[in-house]
Amino acid sequence: MTYQQAGRVAVIKRIAGWLVFIPALLSTLISIINFVYLYSQKGTGVNAVMLDFIHVMTDMARFNTPFLNIFWYNSPVPNLEQGLSAGNIMFFIIYMLIFVGLSLQASGARMSRQVRHIREGIEDQMILERAKGNEGHSREQLEEKIVLPHHTIFLQFFTLYILPSVIGVLGYFVIKLLGIMIQG
C-alpha cells in the first residue's frame, strides 16, 4: 500500500471507528439505564429516595432526548437471571462494538501519524535530492519505494482485549452491589 492510499485508509478507519463507537456507546448506556430502571423495586427509607431519584432521572433523560428514541425503544436490556438469552447476547455484542470502534479509531490515528511522518521525511529527502542536482531522485521515485504495512485492529491489545474485561468485571460488581442495595 502506498502512503497516499494509507492516508485515505487512515481517514476511513477513523471515521468508521467513530461511526461504530458512538451508537454502540449510546446503546450500551441506555441499556444499563433501562436495566437499573426496570430492576429497581420499591423500597423504604434511603433506598426508596435513591430509587425514586433514579426513576425521575431516567424519565427526564428519556423525555428530553426524543432524538434517541431509536435507542430507548430498541436497546437490549440485560437480564441476569436468563444467562445466554438473545437480549444478553445482543447487549454483549453491542458492548464489544464500543471497543471495536475505539480500536478502529486508534488504528486509523496510528496510520495517520505514520503517513504524516513519511510525508515530512519525503519533503526532507527532496531537499537533499535537489542539492545533488541531476543525480538525485525525483519525488515519484522516492514515493514508489515506500510501502506501508497493513494495520489491523486486532493488534490493539489493551483497547480490544484488556479494557472490555476490566470494565465488564467492574460493571458486574456494580450491578451486584446495586442488587444488594435494592433488595435490602
UniProtKB/Swiss-Prot annotation:
Q: Name one GO cellular component term.
A: plasma membrane
**Record carries keyword Protein transport:** no
Keywords for the protein's UniProt record, in alphabetical order:
Cell membrane, Membrane, Transmembrane, Transmembrane helix
**Where is the protein localized?**
Cell membrane
Give membrane topology per the record.
Answer: Multi-pass membrane protein
| Transmembrane regions listed in the UniProt entry | 15-35, 84-104, 162-182
InterPro entries the record matches: YniB-like
**Coiled-coil ranges per UniProt:** none
The family annotation for this protein states: To E.coli YniB.
What is this protein's function per UniProt? Putative regulator of YfeABCD, an ABC transporter locus involved in inorganic iron transport.
Name used for this protein in its record: Putative YfeABCD regulator YfeE
Q: Which organism is it from?
A: Yersinia pestis
Supply the source organism's classification: Bacteria, Pseudomonadati, Pseudomonadota, Gammaproteobacteria, Enterobacterales
Gene encoding the protein:
yfeE
